[in-house]
Each structure stands twice: as C-alpha cells, then as structure tokens.
Amino acid sequence: FSDMFKEYNQNRPSGNKESIWVMQLEYNTPGGGGAYEDWSKRAWVPKYWDETGFTLCDSLGGRGLAQIVPFQWWIESTDFFDATDIRNSEANIKRHWYYNNPETPELLGKPAEMTELTRSKCTLYPAVTKFFYGKTEDDPSYGGNNKDRMKFRLAETYLLLAEARIQQNNAAGAAEAINVVRRRANASEITASQATLDFLLDERIRELVGEELRRLTLVRTGKLVERTRKYNPYSKEIDEHNTLWPIPQTIIDSNTGADFPQNPGYN
C-alpha cells in the first residue's frame, strides 16, 4: 500500500497499476508546478520540528504545518483496523517518533512521547505518511509537495461500486466490491451483513484518508450531520441546513433580473 505513495511510484510506467489519473508535478521545472500547487504535505505532516530534540528531516516529512490532524476516534482506536491490515502499519501511519537533532545529544535517538500536549500543539501525533517526502531531500524546509499526486485510483472505483450496490440494497454485491480492496490490504473479508453504509464510510477512511474530499462523500451519502455529531467533538452544533453552504451575498445581489433565494437556514 505505501509503495503507491512513495516518490516516483505514482505513474503506471513506474509499475503502479492502481493509478487512473495522476497530477504531474516536477520540482524546479517550468510547467511542473511550484510550492503551492499541492499543499498536502504542509497540511498533513506534523510540526515535529517545533519540538525540542527534533530538526527538519526528509524522512519525517519535511516542514509540515499540521493543518489537518486525524481524529483520535479512528487513528488511535485499537479495533478500527484489522491486526493484519497493512494500511495500519508504521509505513502508512507513523506512530513512533525518535529525536533526531544532533544538537541535543542527550535526546538523540531516543523515543519521543506523544501526549495530549504534543497533540494540542500539533507537534507529535499519529501521522498519515501518504504526503511525506516530495523533494524534501533537496531542502527539508521546502514547503511544497512536488511529488506526483494521485487524484483517481482503482481502489476508489471499487468503493464507489460498493456504495452504489448498497443504495440498490445489494449487500452481497457491496461486500464483494469492498473485499477486493480489503484483500489487497491483507484485511479480513466481510460478509453481506457487514456491508452497511457506515462500514463503507469507515473503509473509505482506511483506504482514502487525505485523498477523498470527505465532506462531499458525507453529503452524497446523507451522513454529514449524523457522523459529524458522532465523531467531531468541535462541531456538535452542526444542523441539517449546514449540508448546503450559504450562497455569497454578492452572487445573490448580482442576479438582479431573477429571484435568487438564499439557501435555507442562512437568512
């Protein structure tokens, strides 16, 4: 699984048989994108470098800003992944951090402890490694992510197929599609009775975290409000009308020749 996200492995000529559409990014190349075309590394990599005993390093993901921190309910759960699921391995979710700054020799090489404080500071926490690297070996402080980025890949097509079959009340067919993905991940297969919409949404986290546009998935499946209230402690006040965004007033005002009402709940 982790091989798909290693630098230079995203394209089919490199042997990646799961990629469907890959954004082509080339470091220091005209037309290859700059530091801001793909912000995923800055968003997903912890600010470990801001913790005493650490220094910027390509193998730790470079200069992350930790703008997106995974919720503890899944990434620190003991039963969210099967014990054999490779998507939960250290290669894919970094849970062990070791001090690497030679200027603090008393700490160098020792394990760093993840605590509620390091999580609240966004410095040390279990981190998704999909967005590590990306030309950071040239300059660990480089803010961009010029690693080619997969936008569509085969696993998601199977999960979309499973979603469609669930909506058709074809649980056996949904389980069959989900199991294609789980077999590749060395996870146990599921039965038709387990192929629910909630299981599918959990499977999309296991497979596609950081890749899918999660809000769109939850809106499409009618689960935005329910799962936000259940799993996001900071957004318990979400309401059904929040399924839609408010329409900017400038857009409403520009439609002078037609009635253009605001979405419900925002008047």
Where are these regions (language model features)?
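Flexible, polar/acidic helix-loop-strand segments at domain edges
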Residues: 59-153
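Charged alpha-helical initiation segments
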Residues: 123-137, 176-179, 183-186, 205
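Short, cationic low-complexity segments
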Residues: 38-68
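Long, intrinsically disordered, low-complexity segments
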Residues: 1-47, 141-151, 175, 182, ...
